[in-house]
Amino acid sequence: RADQVLDRLVASGNLTEEEVAGARTHPAEVLARGKDEGREYFVDWIAQQVEEKLPDTTGRIVVYTTLDLRRQRAGEEAVEHALAGMGKERNVSQGSLIALAPDGAVLAMVGGRSYVESQFNRATQAKRQPGSAFKPIVYLAALEAGYTPESPVTDEPVSMGGWSPRNASSRDWGTVNLTTALANSINTISVQVGNRIGIDRIVSTAERLGIEGPLPRNLSIVLGSSEVTLIELASAYTPFGNEGRRTEPYGITSIEAENGDTLYRHVPASEQVIKRE
């Protein structure tokens, strides 16, 4: 990783190959884990964006970000606590977390348990099946198709093409409304609803919320069989708490040159993807 940084410094013209030769010959000693290690995932993510926004910039710059240190510390502690508890019980060694403000500002980002052990950012790079976390998107599609929160739906066995999804518990829910079905994550009802409104509507809704896919064209999508990144899924949730408006996640508020000139400033932008009513 140190060599990659040195290569970038040479490529950008900030240093010559002769100037970095000593650093290559005598690399820095790796220090023990520090208190700020968890923030390095966010720093890496920001560094990539700086290169994309200002590819030809040379010299020193000052980057102002959205990171909230209090929330970042809380996020790191939450991930570690979860991995030490339930994670240990289920043999899960890694986890990630991202906290977004309604306007898309990234307030906290935890890409893994230890940046020293793994620089792979699981919050922005790892694609995982969201499972039941995908269901709010399905139920949004149902509401847009004419269902209401009080629409009655019945918990009954489902079998489609040899696929028979089951609920997490053996409880027979009987007939409940749509709100109760979502609140209790009832698989059988979710699949029935998805079948009635159609896969195309679900896929279209997911894409409108920012899920990039590829999304499966079968009913397993209802139970979260598609693969998404954590930042992608979190971003898809923002319209629910933002009066239906979607914003792209961002981590840089502004970039200044050493002399104070503004080189970049984030301009808030949003798109109405859900009707406010």
What is the predicted role of each segment?
Residues 1-73, 77, 105, 110, ...:
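Non-catalytic, structured segments within soluble enzyme domains
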Residues 4, 9, 75, 104, ...:
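Active-site SXXK
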Residues 5-6, 10, 29-37, 58-66, ...:
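Second-shell loop/turn segments in exported
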Residues 11-30, 89-100, 154-159, 250-261:
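Acidic/histidine-enriched alpha-helical segments
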Residues 34-38, 42, 48, 147-202, ...:
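Conserved catalytic neighborhood of penicillin-recognizing serine enzymes
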Residues 43, 93-97, 105-107, 177-179, ...:
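Short glycine-rich loop/turn motifs
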Residues 45-48, 99-113, 143-147, 158, ...:
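Glycine-rich, acidic and aromatic/proline-enriched surface loops and short helix-turn segments
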Residues 65-88, 97-99, 109, 114-120, ...:
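A penicillin-recognizing enzyme superfamily signal
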